[in-house]
Regions:
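Membrane-core helix-loop-helix motifs of multi-pass transport proteins
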Residues: 126-198, 205-210, 341, 346, ...
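Re-entrant/interfacial helical elements at transmembrane boundaries that shape
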Residues: 81-82, 114-126, 138, 152-166, ...
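Membrane-embedded alpha-helical segments and adjacent helix-loop junctions characteristic
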Residues: 47-135, 268-341
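A small-residue-rich subset of transmembrane alpha-helices
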Residues: 273-274, 349-372, 392-400
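Transmembrane alpha-helix interface/packing and boundary motifs in multi-pass membrane proteins
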Residues: 13-25, 102-111, 142-154, 232-237, ...
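Membrane-interface elements of multi-pass transporters and channels
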Residues: 44, 75, 79, 88, ...
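Alpha-helical transmembrane segments of multi-pass membrane proteins, especially transporters
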Residues: 27, 31, 35, 66, ...
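Hydrophobic transmembrane alpha-helices of multi-pass small-molecule transporters
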Residues: 1-70, 80, 179-185, 189-286, ...
Length: 416
């Protein structure tokens, strides 16, 4: 157990962003190094790593969704959607609402991190053309992509993990969390509108003459068809990973352009990060460490399902600030089956771990992407981000959690 414990602590130290002298490991590097150490120190055998540790379903699902998003970006769909939003916005506040709705909806259909990569440069160009302050709109992309992604199993990486671990059907998951996600988006818009009311107070009508971006109609139609095919497959209960992979493969066949350029936009580092985390977490489980951690927090959580949901939600928000949401969900996924109501526990974990990403700049990859891509407009001070992020975290959490518990009380939650 001791080697596994040391490797676990060292790995999660890197996941928390700690800097170790003479070591330049970042989060993905720390995860891969931890995975290798689990094998070197015989916590796991190579056969266990290949056969048991890595969730290939999650890796394949993430790969398929990233390829699908990449093809849609090359077709010009995201630029065209941004142009339509800018043309139809009549004021700064209506443009802010459009950014929240578009980022949230696209993140529910695709993967929020990818949406941030694709949409942030478009939003920057939009606000420059409209001569508007960029900060409210950049935060709208980050916060709304997190909030909107709550709604589906494919909205973000941690939801994909929850889907793999819990076996909750896509349709059941969305039926339970669609309304909390919509209400969370409304809360995000309200928070941003109040926080930046001085900058958005202009009453002038937006009249921006921006030429329409190039839209490859044939490829766009193929992308729309593939997206309908994939979502329909999800709803009908087909295997998520292979449905996404088949949909993306069909797009590669029917669209123009070399696949190499599409694959170049796939985040291979993220896939390696996931693989490393899977191995480290499996080693922790094999050594019994995860079970001991749960025994330590179990008395605090209580035995009632309602108590467990609320208290574990608070614990989740705090833990996600330390190690980010994906590593925490991998660890917490071993505890939820022991809850009084595991089905509610999985849904609560998805809600809390995702919305926790709005609290600090490092709490979610989506935040880091938006701040990096929008960085030429100046850095966002940490405490200014937290000031707005706290409201964009806790208000949606209170509203979303209350909605989820009311659904459970009324018997509206689909069964596991």
């Amino acid at each position: 157990m001791l080697p596994a414990l040391i490797i676990f602590c060292a790995t999660y130290l890197f996941l928390a962003g700690a800097e170790v002298p003479f070591l330049k490991l970042d989060r993905p590097g720390g995860a891969v190094a931890g995975a290798a150490a689990m094998v070197v120190f015989r916590v796991l055998t190579p056969e266990q790593v290949y056969r048991d540790a890595i969730s290939w379903d999650t890796i394949v699902l993430l790969l398929g969704m990233m390829v699908l998003s990449s093809v849609m970006a090359r077709a010009g769909i995201f630029r065209w959607v941004g142009w339509v939003a800018l043309r139809r916005a009549h004021s700064p506040t209506s443009l802010l609402a459009a950014v929240v709705v578009v980022a949230g909806a696209l993140s529910a259909l695709l993967v929020n991190d990818t949406i941030c990569v694709m949409c942030t440069p478009i939003v920057v160009a939009m606000v420059e053309a409209a001569n508007l302050p960029p900060l409210p709109f950049l935060l709208a992309v980050a916060f709304a992509s997190n909030a909107g992604s709550v709604a589906t199993l494919t909205g973000n990486p941690q939801n994909m993990l929850i889907g793999t671990l819990s076996k909750i059907p896509y349709a059941h998951f969305t039926a339970a969390l669609a309304l909390p996600a919509i209400l969370s988006l409304a809360c995000v818009h309200l928070v941003l509108r109040l926080a930046f009311r001085e900058q958005l107070r202009e009453r002038r009508r937006l009249d921006v003459d921006v030429p329409a971006p190039e839209l490859h109609r044939g490829n766009a139609i193929a992308c729309a068809g593939a997206l309908v095919f994939v979502v329909a497959g999800f709803v009908l209960g087909y295997d998520l990973a292979w449905t996404a992979l088949v949909g993306s493969a069909l797009l590669l066949v029917v669209t123009r352009g070399p696949p190499r350029e599409i694959f170049a936009q796939v985040d291979g580092v993220l896939l390696l990060f996931f693989a490393g985390l899977f191995v480290v977490t499996h080693g922790v489980a094999q050594a019994g460490i995860a079970e001991r951690i749960f025994r330590g927090i179990e008395p605090v959580l209580g035995s009632d399902a309602l108590q467990q949901t609320i208290r574990f939600g608070g614990f989740t928000v705090a833990a996600c600030q330390l190690v980010s949401n994906v590593p925490f969900v991998l660890l917490a996924g071993q505890w939820v089956p022991h809850f009084a109501d595991p089905h509610l526990g999985w849904l609560g974990l998805a809600l809390f771990s995702t919305l926790a990403g709005n609290l600090t700049p490092v709490a979610s990859v989506a935040n880091l992407i938006v701040l990096e891509l929008g960085g030429r407009h100046g850095k966002v001070p940490f405490f200014q981000f937290v000031k707005v992020g706290a409201a964009a975290t806790f208000l949606p959490l209170v509203v979303g959690c209350a909605c989820l518990l009311v659904e459970r009380r009324l018997g509206l939650l689909p069964g596991p």
